[in-house]
Amino acid sequence: AYAMRVDTFPDDGEFAGSDPDLMFRQLIMEAGADIAILEPLAFGARLPEAAQASAIATNLWIDEHWLSSTTNWHQRWRGSISVAIEDPEGAAREIEKWAGHPYMAQILIKAEPRPSWGDPRYDPIWQAATKHDITVSCHLARGSFETLPIPPVGFPSYNHDFMVSYSLLAANQVMSLIFDGVFDRYPTLRIVLVEH
């Protein structure tokens, strides 16, 4: 919500970007996009169980509110399978549940939880992604304070300082994927880093 366009707030006062008809007009018709991949960021729970419950609810909401035949009549919305990376087994179950959905285009994770992605504990996620040939996307998220990236000069004072630090987090996660052998174990795994 820090960088939302003011014109994305619907007339009914709901959250920015929450109205499929308004977003269709702005993102598809006016911007000229062929499709739009939705990346809902509904995380922030400190407990893995709560993060998993949030991911499950988000997927149900995306399916009902954005991908139904009523709101996706034009077939140009694509959803993201939100998963709680903190609960790899639960995340894999959620991937299995939604992998066959015709409009779920990718798996959505966040970068902040520790340990880094190369840790074998995350293998159920990578295994499910490669089994179903679905790209894993990581979008910037705002985790709890102790999970945020810390720049070499200390904690950020301003939002723009904080945003720049995400490139460090992304670089560390990519190094972990490579050096900890994830791409050796799952050579067809595809990962996209958004806004890093």
Predicted regions and their residues:
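Helix-coil boundary/capping segments in enzymes
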Residues: 1-196
